[in-house]
Regions:
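Low-complexity, glycine- and small/polar-enriched segments
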Residues: 1-175
Length: 175
């Protein structure tokens, strides 16, 4: 699997209960997540990869696997004013377990392009990237990660098995 260009993640597997998803870019406000919801459950996520994965663009992860109860997801921003990233007033917003088994080689070259990202998040959160052109935050700019006044939300277990070679050359691009 090879991708080129900004925000071009190779594999994105998500189970999100009550909101979230993937937003490539926005010039205006962005809101990801549920509000005033109860008993939201995201399912389990399992990814098995044996292929070669290569990405070259900014904010282009190799593999992302997420189970997020009640909000969150993936946002890649180049120009943004307001971002609300998570839930509000969520009750029992539970995430499932996430399992990744990778035997393939993964290489990313862009900035903020993690090789493998695995998350189980109850009630909000996720992954946000910004570019070098993103304006500095001021009173009119806002980035909020996480949930507000959520109750009894919990995350599931995470299991990652990797026997492939991982290589990242971009700034802020972790394994």
């Amino acid at each position: 699997i090879k991708t080129f260009g900004e925000g071009a993640t190779a594999i994105l597997a998500q189970s999100i209960g009550g909101g979230g998803g993937f937003v490539g870019a926005s010039k205006d406000g962005v809101a990801l997540g549920g509000e005033t919801q109860s008993n939201i459950t995201a399912g389990d996520v399992t990814v098995t990869n044996s292929s070669l994965i290569q990405t070259t663009g900014k904010a282009s992860a190799g593999l992302i696997a997420q189970s997020i109860g009640g909000g969150g997801g993936v946002v890649s921003i180049t120009e943004s004013e307001k971002i609300s990233f998570g839930g509000s007033g969520l009750i029992n917003a539970d995430a499932g377990s996430v399992k990744v088994k990778n035997t393939g080689n993964i290489a990313t070259a862009g900035i903020t392009s993690p090789l493998i990202m695995v998350q189980s998040i109850g009630g909000g959160g996720g992954f946000t990237t910004t570019s070098d052109q993103t304006p500095a935050l001021s009173k009119t700019n806002l980035i909020r990660l996480g949930d507000i006044s959520s109750q009894r939300s919990k995350a599931g277990s995470i299991n990652v098995e990797n026997s492939g070679t991982l290589f990242s050359s971009g700034r802020s691009s972790s394994a």
